[in-house]
């Protein structure tokens, strides 16, 4: 074969390759055009009309805000004529007297239920709640919005009756649609003790209407919990155990239409934020009514609410801008030598837990479990029938101790801060702080175990030089509740440490970023 023939053959091969490439390129382009056309058509169908604008449906469920058309939102609360006819001055006076603030972005302006007579529920539920003299402020204000299917944030002190505030509308919604199966009401709570307490309150309602309720928390075997979950419509759970059961496929939350985050601020403090988000994503945002109850309203809680709630109504009871203690509690603060605290405790028990006061409930707080175990032994040695809940005890022992205290079998309970918030122990007359807690916020939550449900109570606190950095905050709380401030406490100073920034510590300060930097010249 000549050189010319070889060259000619090569040219033909190259030409064929070029033609093939052009064909391939054209084929790919046609395929791409076809796909784009198909996608365009698909997107067109996925668009929803909202007024005059077209809004594209989001792709990611985790970023999707819940729609207002939830299953429970279809229920419509009708305000009674008797409540409507009340003069506005009565409503204004009620709001002022109870320091109530409502942020209602939907402008519904629903009136608070000043009496159970203004509420129309199933007779069995009505009979149960009517055992109380009247709704608590959080119940009175929140019920109309919750019965209307709205999302609600409740900011209120512990012991304000919030369990029935979310429990009564939950059971009422369940009764309106009894055909549904699976878990419909989910309450997430930070601790086993609080979860058990909520369960004890809710089961009173579910038993009345023939519904199943179960409580799920760690520290006990899962087998019985798996069985209970399969037949329950109402579930109270701690985040850790619920997530475990979700990950192993033992629980289905797709039917949940009423979600409650109780003590939301405390759950975030304990590091449950990601767990909570993962749990919420297992529910259907389009049919979920979401409730959040919290004692404080920090940035983290606000962000959680904005992510998973739809135009929530915010109901605040009391002054939530600053830390305040229940004014029905007589606060006594005594500055003592740390070495004499346990001897002083025995003196206080003679004052608050002997003679005519022998049967009055007294709650003693220690700071750490080792201290609690030592004090428990000392009290028993001195003849006191004391129950205890702290970290060294098993879940069964803690539950038994709490039940003994509630029933009156033991009227003296020793606890660490595991029980400082949320535990609803009725008729606690006196709280003794043997060791001051790590924060003034915890102090307020501790003493909030007494003076509940309109009753009065006493909180006696032993304060030492070791806690002097907290003196200023404690003085503010005492002044805010019109309580006497001991001279020995003022000697420690009344300044309060600035709240630390998460990244910059106590050196953080707000800077006006709009100001331009000054030009500095050197001569």
Curated annotation (Swiss-Prot):
Keyword field contains Translocase: no
Compositionally biased residues, Basic residues: 22-48
Predominant location category: nucleus
Domain of life: Eukaryota
Stored InterPro entries: DEAD/DEAH_box_helicase_dom, Helicase_ATP-bd, Helicase_C-like, P-loop_NTPase, RNA-helicase_DEAD-box_CS
Cellular component terms (Gene Ontology): nucleolus; preribosome, large subunit precursor
Catalysed reactions listed for this entry: ATP + H2O = ADP + phosphate + H(+)
UniProt free text on domains: The Q motif is unique to and characteristic of the DEAD box family of RNA helicases and controls ATP binding and hydrolysis.
Functional note: ATP-dependent RNA helicase required for 60S ribosomal subunit synthesis. Involved in efficient pre-rRNA processing, predominantly at site A3, which is necessary for the normal formation of 25S and 5.8S rRNAs.
Protein name (Swiss-Prot/TrEMBL): ATP-dependent RNA helicase DBP3
Taxonomic lineage of the native organism: Eukaryota, Fungi, Dikarya, Ascomycota, Saccharomycotina
């Amino acid at each position: 074969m000549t050189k010319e023939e070889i060259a000619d053959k090569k040219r033909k091969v190259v030409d064929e390759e070029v033609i093939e490439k052009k064909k391939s390129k054209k084929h790919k382009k046609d395929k791409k055009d076809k796909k784009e056309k198909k996608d365009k058509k698909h997107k067109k169908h996925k668009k929803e009309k909202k007024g005059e604008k077209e809004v594209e449906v989001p792709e990611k469920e985790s970023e999707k805000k819940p729609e207002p058309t939830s299953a429970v939102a279809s229920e419509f609360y009708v305000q009674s004529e008797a409540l409507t006819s009340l003069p506005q001055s009565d409503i204004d006076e009620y709001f002022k007297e109870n320091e109530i603030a409502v942020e209602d972005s939907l402008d519904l302006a629903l009136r608070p239920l000043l009496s159970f007579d203004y509420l129309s529920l199933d007779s069995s539920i009505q009979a149960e709640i009517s055992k109380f003299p009247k709704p608590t402020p959080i119940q009175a204000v929140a019920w109309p919005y919750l019965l209307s299917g709205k999302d609600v944030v409740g900011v209120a002190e512990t012991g304000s009756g919030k369990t029935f505030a979310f429990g009564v509308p939950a059971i009422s919604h369940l009764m309106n649609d009894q055909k549904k199966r699976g878990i419909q009401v989910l309450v997430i709570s930070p601790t086993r003790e609080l979860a058990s307490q909520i369960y004890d309150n809710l089961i009173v309602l579910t038993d009345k209407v023939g519904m199943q309720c179960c409580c799920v928390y760690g520290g006990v075997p899962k087998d019985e919990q798996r069985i209970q979950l399969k037949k329950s419509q109402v579930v109270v759970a701690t985040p850790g155990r619920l997530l475990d059961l979700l990950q192993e496929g033992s629980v289905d939350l797709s039917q949940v239409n009423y979600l409650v985050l109780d003590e939301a601020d405390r759950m975030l403090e304990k590091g449950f934020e990601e767990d909570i988000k993962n749990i919420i994503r297992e529910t259907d945002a389009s049919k979920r009514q979401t409730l959040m109850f919290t004692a404080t309203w920090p940035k983290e809680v606000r962000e959680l609410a904005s992510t998973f709630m739809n135009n929530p109504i915010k109901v605040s009871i009391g002054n939530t801008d600053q830390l305040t203690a229940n004014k029905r509690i007589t606060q006594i603060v005594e500055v003592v030598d740390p070495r004499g605290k346990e001897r002083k405790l025995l003196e206080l028990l003679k004052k608050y837990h002997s003679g005519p006061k022998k049967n009055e409930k007294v709650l003693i707080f220690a700071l750490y479990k080792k201290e609690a175990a030592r004090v428990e032994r000392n009290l028993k040695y001195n003849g006191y029938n004391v129950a205890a809940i702290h970290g060294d005890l098993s879940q069964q022992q803690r539950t038994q101790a709490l039940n003994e205290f509630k029933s009156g079998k033991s009227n003296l309970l020793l606890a660490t801060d595991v029980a400082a918030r949320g535990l609803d122990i009725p008729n606690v007359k006196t709280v003794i702080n043997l060791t001051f807690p790590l924060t003034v916020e915890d102090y307020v939550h501790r003493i909030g175990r007494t003076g509940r449900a309109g009753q009065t109570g006493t909180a006696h606190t032993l304060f030492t030089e070791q806690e002097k950095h907290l003196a200023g905050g404690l003085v503010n709380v005492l002044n805010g509740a019109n309580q006497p401030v001991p001279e020995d406490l003022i000697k420690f100073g009344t300044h309060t440490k600035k709240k630390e920034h998460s990244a910059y510590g106590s050196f953080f300060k707000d800077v006006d970023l709009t100001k331009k930097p000054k030009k500095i010249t050197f001569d």
